[in-house]
């Protein structure tokens, strides 16, 4: 019999904090008040739930060139005024980052740049500098020499993220990591990456529009589906504090195929324009195209309009879009989409001072939606004089005097009142 010495496993972790723990009663756990660090960008603070939480691990994903590095560089310059920032880049040199940082704003003395891809070296510098905030750009470029596999591989991304999580919890450092996305729009790397971090943010936008949307899809320290809206300018990202006004400012009065919806993004009401163009089909089957709207939802709405409202759409091409590049995907947009389609089909414009909220059922009924009071108040604040909402949603709410609220039950009733 031969005795064999077993090598110690280097990657074994005791806990998130690196210390041995034992089970505790929930009542015995000490509560703490988390002091969030606010940036100068209120839109960014809102998406995070009120500011940056110490010891949190935040993942930001988005298409290449959409502005992820610009956003984090801008946030870093602001955070360096209240704490020490270490910006680790595996994609650009320190000189390249300096050029961009000078364009974005003042650079504080507590802003450290580090062009490195070795996780051991990054950990060593974190222990030496002891920053309050750490930015990793990007997670796919950082590798640990203790793990087999090339940069960006599943094993490397998983282990480096786990090490960063332990680093954040042990040293109470807020860490932001940039993640690439695939052509399908999901984060590249293992799916468990999103489960490991505290917060997942997506930075979205159309290449041909200057507006960018920062969306929270997971947040352990705040509500999900919150959004922040920015505009990309020569000096960096600028907050859009009144997005409804921006999305509606180019709307033409008297144009057919247009309607306004009050949609909710997280806890925030936003008014957006839905446009429809319905034209006779020239060849074979009717064509359906959507931009910023769900294709299946649009097809369902057109089927309901044909069956319940008597619109002959089977031989009509339909082109639908949300103006301004914003994506609308909640059920409450159904009524506005239906009205826009009917407006184009009938070639009759809607009243520019009217807006619409409601989910459309297959039998033609208008179903209740959430946060109806917030939606009505937002429409009134922006000067709209009339809003169509589900009648069942009006129970127990206080209606503002500045706007006429019309409760409706069916799509036939809505079209009769709008196009009378």
Curated annotation (Swiss-Prot):
<dbReference type="InterPro" id="IPR027417">
    <property type="entry name" value="P-loop_NTPase"/>
</dbReference>
<dbReference type="Pfam" id="PF13481">
    <property type="entry name" value="AAA_25"/>
</dbReference>
<keyword id="KW-0547">Nucleotide-binding</keyword>
<keyword id="KW-0227">DNA damage</keyword>
<keyword id="KW-0067">ATP-binding</keyword>
<dbReference type="GO" id="GO:0016887">
    <property type="term" value="F:ATP hydrolysis activity"/>
</dbReference>
<dbReference type="GO" id="GO:0003684">
    <property type="term" value="F:damaged DNA binding"/>
</dbReference>
<dbReference type="InterPro" id="IPR014721">
    <property type="entry name" value="Ribsml_uS5_D2-typ_fold_subgr"/>
</dbReference>
<dbReference type="GO" id="GO:0046872">
    <property type="term" value="F:metal ion binding"/>
</dbReference>
<comment type="similarity">
    <text>Belongs to the RecA family. RadA subfamily.</text>
</comment>
<dbReference type="InterPro" id="IPR003593">
    <property type="entry name" value="AAA+_ATPase"/>
</dbReference>
<feature type="short sequence motif" description="RadA KNRFG motif">
    <location>
        <begin position="218"/>
        <end position="222"/>
    </location>
</feature>
<keyword id="KW-0234">DNA repair</keyword>
<dbReference type="InterPro" id="IPR020588">
    <property type="entry name" value="RecA_ATP-bd"/>
</dbReference>
<dbReference type="GO" id="GO:0005524">
    <property type="term" value="F:ATP binding"/>
</dbReference>
<dbReference type="InterPro" id="IPR020568">
    <property type="entry name" value="Ribosomal_Su5_D2-typ_SF"/>
</dbReference>
<keyword id="KW-0479">Metal-binding</keyword>
<dbReference type="GO" id="GO:0000725">
    <property type="term" value="P:recombinational repair"/>
</dbReference>
<dbReference type="InterPro" id="IPR004504">
    <property type="entry name" value="DNA_repair_RadA"/>
</dbReference>
<comment type="function">
    <text>Plays a role in repairing double-strand DNA breaks, probably involving stabilizing or processing branched DNA or blocked replication forks. Required for efficient transformation with chromosomal (linear) DNA, but not for replicative plasmid DNA. Its increased sensitivity to a DNA damaging agent suggests it may be required for DNA repair.</text>
</comment>
<keyword id="KW-0378">Hydrolase</keyword>
<dbReference type="Pfam" id="PF13541">
    <property type="entry name" value="ChlI"/>
</dbReference>
<dbReference type="GO" id="GO:0140664">
    <property type="term" value="F:ATP-dependent DNA damage sensor activity"/>
</dbReference>
<feature type="binding site">
    <location>
        <begin position="62"/>
        <end position="69"/>
    </location>
    <ligand>
        <name>ATP</name>
    </ligand>
</feature>
<keyword id="KW-0346">Stress response</keyword>
<keyword id="KW-0238">DNA-binding</keyword>
<feature type="region of interest" description="Lon-protease-like">
    <location>
        <begin position="317"/>
        <end position="420"/>
    </location>
</feature>
<protein>
    <recommendedName>
        <fullName>DNA repair protein RadA</fullName>
        <ecNumber>3.6.4.-</ecNumber>
    </recommendedName>
</protein>
């Amino acid at each position: 019999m031969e005795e064999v010495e077993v090598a110690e496993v280097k990657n074994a972790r005791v806990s998130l904090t690196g210390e041995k723990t034992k089970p505790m009663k929930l009542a015995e756990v000490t509560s703490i008040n988390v002091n969030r660090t606010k940036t100068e960008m209120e839109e960014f603070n809102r998406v995070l739930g009120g500011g940056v939480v110490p010891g949190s691990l935040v993942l930001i994903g988005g298409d290449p060139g959409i502005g992820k590095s610009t956003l984090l560089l801008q946030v870093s310059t602001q955070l360096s005024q209240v704490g020490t920032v270490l910006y680790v880049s595996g994609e650009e040199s320190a000189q390249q980052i300096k050029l961009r940082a000078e364009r974005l704003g003042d650079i504080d003395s507590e802003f450290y740049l580090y062009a490195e891809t070795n996780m051991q070296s990054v950990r060593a510098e974190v222990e030496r500098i002891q920053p309050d905030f750490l930015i990793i750009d990007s997670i796919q470029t950082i590798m640990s020499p203790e793990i087999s596999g090339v940069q960006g591989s599943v094993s490397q991304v998983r282990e480096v993220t786990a090490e960063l999580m332990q680093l954040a919890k042990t040293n109470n450092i807020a860490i932001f990591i940039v993640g690439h996305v695939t052509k399908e729009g999901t984060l590249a790397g293992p799916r468990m990456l999103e489960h490991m971090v505290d917060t997942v943010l997506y930075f979205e936008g159309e290449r041909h529009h200057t507006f960018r949307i920062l969306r929270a899809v997971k947040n352990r320290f705040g509500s999900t589906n919150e959004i922040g809206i920015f505009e990309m300018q020569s000096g960096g990202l600028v907050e859009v504090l009144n997005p409804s006004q921006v999305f509606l400012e180019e709307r033409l009065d008297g144009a057919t195929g247009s309607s306004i919806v009050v949609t909710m993004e997280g806890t925030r009401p936003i008014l957006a324009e839905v446009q429809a163009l319905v034209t006779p089909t020239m060849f074979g089957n009717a064509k359906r195209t959507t931009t910023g709207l769900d294709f299946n939802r649009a097809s369902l709405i057109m089927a309901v309009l044909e069956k319940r409202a008597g619109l002959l759409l089977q031989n009509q091409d339909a082109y639908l879009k949300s103006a301004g590049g914003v994506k609308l995907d909640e059920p409450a947009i159904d009524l506005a989409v239906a009205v826009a389609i009917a407006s184009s089909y009938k070639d009759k414009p809607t009243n520019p001072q009217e807006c619409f909220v409601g989910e459309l059922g297959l039998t033609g009924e208008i179903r209740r939606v959430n946060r109806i009071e917030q939606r009505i108040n937002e429409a009134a604040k922006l000067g709209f004089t009339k809003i169509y909402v589900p009648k069942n949603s009006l129970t127990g709410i206080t209606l503002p005097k500045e706007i006429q609220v019309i409760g409706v039950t069916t799509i036939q009733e809505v079209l009769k009142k709008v196009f009378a």
